Amino acid sequence: MAQWDSFTDQQEDTDSCSESVKFDARSNTALLPPNPKNGPPLQEKLKSFKAALIALYLLVFAVLIPIIAIMAAQLLKWEMKNCTVGSINANSVSSSLLGRGNDSEHEVRFREVVMEHISKMEKRIQYISDTEENLVDSEHFQNFSVTTDQRFADVLLQLSTLVPTVQGHGNAVDEITRSLISLNTTLLDLHLYVETLNVKFQENTLKGQEEISKLKERVHNASAEIMSMKEEQVHLEQEIKREVKVLNNITNDLRLKDWEHSQTLRNITLIQGPPGPPGEKGDRGPTGESGPPGVPGPVGPPGLKGDRGSIGFPGSRGYPGQSGKTGRTGYPGPKGQKGEKGSGSILTPSATVRLVGGRGPHEGRVEILHNGQWGTVCDDHWELRAGQVVCRSLGYRGVKSVHKKAYFGQGTGPIWLNEVPCLGMESSIEECKIRQWGVRVCSHGEDAGVTCTL
């Protein structure tokens, strides 16, 4: 019973120790300064510390409960052993009172029972010593729990001191987030500005490309006009040479006539013949020196007017001259008034132009009929304006695209045209400025093609 009382005293001590630990934990948590501005991370840390404290208490109770159960079981076994020893003593006394007939057998049995009880008692004593050691160990554990509580209190104090530093770090983090947000907005503004600059640069490049293409067209048109002016200059030089030749022939004829007149004047004799008819009145010459007055002669009668001669025979008709070259195409006239809506009928296609090798009649390699033979067109300076003329001559509304490098396959026969400068207003390709028919500097690998709009 004394042991049981000591055990209950130890249990009360452990309960009081646990209550003191709880009170210390509560007091430590109460010592923490209330700060409504603490962020969620600090609250979560406090919650985690509370959970760790509760787990520590549960661990202490889990260790103490088995120790208490072991002590109670040992005490119950001790009481049962005392009862069994008393019953054995009573049985031995009763057996001695009944008789001593079978003393030897009873003595042997009694000794065996006593030896068994002695061995059991030794085991129980050993077990009690072990339980005492466990109790000593439990006291060490209590001391360890007290030290851990003290350490936990120190940790809570350190946490209370760390709260303002954590708040300062939180404020710094808030400032950093604000600066990051401002940097993000500035980066977005820069991105939008760069995108606008990119769009403007693309627009400027497109405008520059369009202007360059227009300048190329103007240069091409100027080069075509220069070539036409050179051709006109050549024609004028040839005409001037012909006129000079004609003038030389006329001057030679005049010289011959003058020489004939001079020869006839030389052959005139000095014998005075009958007076001829009066000549026409000449121009008034310069006033000469007055000579001596001569003897006045008789006045002759006036002559009669002669008859008009007969008309001579007409000369033979001359040979026809060479046909001149086609003149330069004039500038387009003013735009006419809008005509009435037609019936939608397709224009009659040209009989001198065709498209070969395409997937339909609206596209293919351009071939032209000249001198009864079909030929191709070289793709040098082959542009949309020439394709527009070809498509309109075939009865289509316009041109979709032009093709080079024998896109629809190589043709056969002659290559009639090269570098066809068209204005786009001609009704057929024959009306464009064609320099010459028949090209030798181009091959069928450069045959031109076109795709018309349906």
From Swiss-Prot:
Q: Which residues carry this modification: Phosphoserine?
A: S27
Q: What is its main location?
A: membrane
Q: What's its membrane topology?
A: Single-pass type II membrane protein
Q: Which residues cross the membrane?
A: 51-73
List, alphabetically, the InterPro entries matched. Answer: Collagen, SR-AI/II, SRCR, SRCR-like_dom_sf
Which residues lie toward the Extracellular compartment?
Answer: 74-454
Q: Which GO terms describe its cellular component?
A: collagen trimer; low-density lipoprotein particle; plasma membrane
Q: Which residues lie on this side of the membrane: Cytoplasmic?
A: 1-50
Q: Which GO terms describe its biological process?
A: receptor-mediated endocytosis; zymogen activation
- This protein's source sits in the domain of life called Eukaryota
Location(s), subcellular: Membrane
Q: Which ranges carry the Collagen-like domain?
A: 273-344
Q: Which residues form a coiled coil?
A: 199-256
According to its UniProt entry, the function of this protein is described as: Membrane glycoproteins implicated in the pathologic deposition of cholesterol in arterial walls during atherogenesis. Two types of receptor subunits exist. These receptors mediate the endocytosis of a diverse group of macromolecules, including modified low density lipoproteins (LDL).
Partners and quaternary state?
Homotrimer. Interacts with MYO18A.
Q: Give the protein name, as stated in the record.
A: Macrophage scavenger receptor types I and II
According to its UniProt entry, this protein's organism is Oryctolagus cuniculus
Q: Which gene encodes it?
A: MSR1
